[in-house]
Amino acid sequence: SALFLAMHYTPDTLTAFSSVTHICRDVNYGWLIRYIHANGASLFFICLYLHIGRGIYYGSYSYMETWNIGIILLFLTMA
């Protein structure tokens, strides 16, 4: 869904809001693509936090190299 949104979105500060309005009103099922993208991104981060919680619960933080690589990947995902 991100690819379809990127085809119509403009990141310029003056036209960003109007491009989102264009996606929701003028693109066929643009409103649906936008909501699927937003909910999919939220679900992705919920799964990411659950995965971290599972690692904390099972004591995976004791494997320092693996844990640090995971933290770096988390920060890169959020950047």
UniProtKB/Swiss-Prot annotation:
Residues the record lists as binding heme b b562:
37
Residues that span the membrane, as ranges: 1-7, 31-52, 67-79
Q: Which gene encodes it?
A: MT-CYB
Top-level division of the source organism's lineage: Eukaryota
Remaining remarks: Heme 1 (or BL or b562) is low-potential and absorbs at about 562 nm, and heme 2 (or BH or b566) is high-potential and absorbs at about 566 nm.
PROSITE patterns linked to this entry:
CYTB_NTER
Q: How is the cofactor bound?
A: Binds 2 heme b groups non-covalently.
Know the name of this protein? Cytochrome b
Q: What is the lineage of its organism?
A: Eukaryota, Metazoa, Chordata, Craniata, Vertebrata
Q: What family classification does the UniProt entry report for this protein?
A: Belongs to the cytochrome b family.
Whose protein is this, by species? Answer: Dipodomys panamintinus
**Entries under SUPFAM superfamilies matching the protein:** Transmembrane di-heme cytochromes
> Which GO terms fall under molecular function for this chain's record?
metal ion binding; ubiquinol-cytochrome-c reductase activity
